[in-house]
Curated annotation (Swiss-Prot):
<keyword id="KW-0067">ATP-binding</keyword>
<dbReference type="InterPro" id="IPR011762">
    <property type="entry name" value="COA_CT_N"/>
</dbReference>
<keyword id="KW-0808">Transferase</keyword>
<dbReference type="Pfam" id="PF01039">
    <property type="entry name" value="Carboxyl_trans"/>
</dbReference>
<comment type="pathway">
    <text>Lipid metabolism; malonyl-CoA biosynthesis; malonyl-CoA from acetyl-CoA: step 1/1.</text>
</comment>
<keyword id="KW-0963">Cytoplasm</keyword>
<feature type="domain" description="CoA carboxyltransferase N-terminal">
    <location>
        <begin position="23"/>
        <end position="289"/>
    </location>
</feature>
<comment type="similarity">
    <text>Belongs to the AccD/PCCB family.</text>
</comment>
<dbReference type="GO" id="GO:0006633">
    <property type="term" value="P:fatty acid biosynthetic process"/>
</dbReference>
<keyword id="KW-0479">Metal-binding</keyword>
<feature type="binding site">
    <location>
        <position position="30"/>
    </location>
    <ligand>
        <name>Zn(2+)</name>
    </ligand>
</feature>
<dbReference type="InterPro" id="IPR041010">
    <property type="entry name" value="Znf-ACC"/>
</dbReference>
<dbReference type="GO" id="GO:0009329">
    <property type="term" value="C:acetate CoA-transferase complex"/>
</dbReference>
<feature type="binding site">
    <location>
        <position position="27"/>
    </location>
    <ligand>
        <name>Zn(2+)</name>
    </ligand>
</feature>
<comment type="subunit">
    <text>Acetyl-CoA carboxylase is a heterohexamer composed of biotin carboxyl carrier protein (AccB), biotin carboxylase (AccC) and two subunits each of ACCase subunit alpha (AccA) and ACCase subunit beta (AccD).</text>
</comment>
<dbReference type="InterPro" id="IPR034733">
    <property type="entry name" value="AcCoA_carboxyl_beta"/>
</dbReference>
<comment type="function">
    <text>Component of the acetyl coenzyme A carboxylase (ACC) complex. Biotin carboxylase (BC) catalyzes the carboxylation of biotin on its carrier protein (BCCP) and then the CO(2) group is transferred by the transcarboxylase to acetyl-CoA to form malonyl-CoA.</text>
</comment>
Length: 289
């Protein structure tokens, strides 16, 4: 029996009914071969090298939100095409492709949930929709989430995974950087916590605005975080970049973020921080002082 035949027999015997060899996943970092159910159980973290893979929005929801507590808001908001923008495709076409791919109308889900028992407003970026880019709808959803947090005296968690501002909306998308930053300033004035969670990747206009305005900034291990890409920076300055540049570990070492938290500990960490920094959560009587 040749190796190819042996491998087919091995995977066929290991797989249960209805499964196939495609259910084996290779780690992008260490090339370890893992069974897909093991990967799911580990929140898409390699058990061999601890590499944190990119995961779907639905997996993020399951990982962070207490079961059955998420109430989505503003799901009906959809981007328009005020500039009739066309690159290789029209913007309208890209929006439709994003809808078909994700089943959602924008790159952001916003809503209210409980995280380890603590009620909070939450905003989750979806990289599968146009690279998680920030457009006018996404900015509006963030502002509305801030408004609800202010109204209900809750904290806010924003999970970023984005390539930056959406070029197809030009100045409209760039305006969201100032718009979201101004809204978050009101949350800060109200002494309500904003926790910014940076995941791979968090780049461009997102990193240059609300992603780094958190009262507490947390990153996942190995996340790529920055403004311009490393290659562009290297070509611009004409010099080599430090080892590990634009990684979460590099940012922590240089004091730009507060902590790096593994995925399996993220929910408890967020719940503890929200409970500790929001005085209204445990003491609702403070609302009347």
């Amino acid at each position: 029996m040749g190796f190819a035949d042996f491998f087919k027999t091995f995977t066929r015997e290991r797989a249960k009914e209805g499964e196939s060899p495609s259910h084996w996943i290779k780690c992008p970092s260490c090339s370890a071969l893992m069974y897909y159910k093991e990967v799911i159980a580990q929140h898409h973290v390699c058990p061999k090298c601890n590499f944190h893979m990119r995961i779907a929005l639905e997996d993020r929801i399951e990982m962070l939100c207490d079961e059955g507590t998420l109430i989505e808001h503003d799901a009906s908001l959809e981007p328009t095409d005020p500039l009739t923008f066309v690159d290789k495709k029209s913007y309208k076409k890209r929006i439709e492709e994003g809808k078909q791919k994700t089943g959602r109308a924008s790159s952001v889900l916003s809503g209210e949930c409980r995280i380890n028992g603590v009620s909070t407003q939450i905003v989750l970026f979806n990289f599968a929709f146009m690279g998680g880019s920030l457009g006018s709808v996404e900015g509006e959803k963030i502002v509305r989430a801030v408004n609800r947090a202010l109204e209900k005296h809750q904290g806010l968690v924003i999970l970023s995974t984005s390539g930056g501002a959406r070029m197809q909306e030009s100045t409209y998308s760039l305006m969201q950087m100032a718009k979201t930053s101004a809204a978050l300033a009101r949350l800060s004035q109200a002494k309500l916590p904003f926790i910014s969670l940076l995941t791979d990747p968090t780049m461009g206009g997102v990193s240059a605005s609300f992603a780094f305005l958190g009262d507490i900034i947390i990153a996942e291990p190995g996340a790529m975080v920055g403004f311009a890409g490393a290659r562009v920076i290297k070509q611009t300055i004409g010099a080599d970049l430090p080892e590990g540049f634009q990684t979460a570990e590099f940012l922590l070492e240089h004091g730009l973020i507060d902590m790096i938290t593994p995925r399996k500990e993220m929910k408890k960490t967020l719940g503890d921080l929200l409970r500790f920094f929001n005085p209204y959560d445990e003491n609702p009587c403070l609302l009347h002082l």
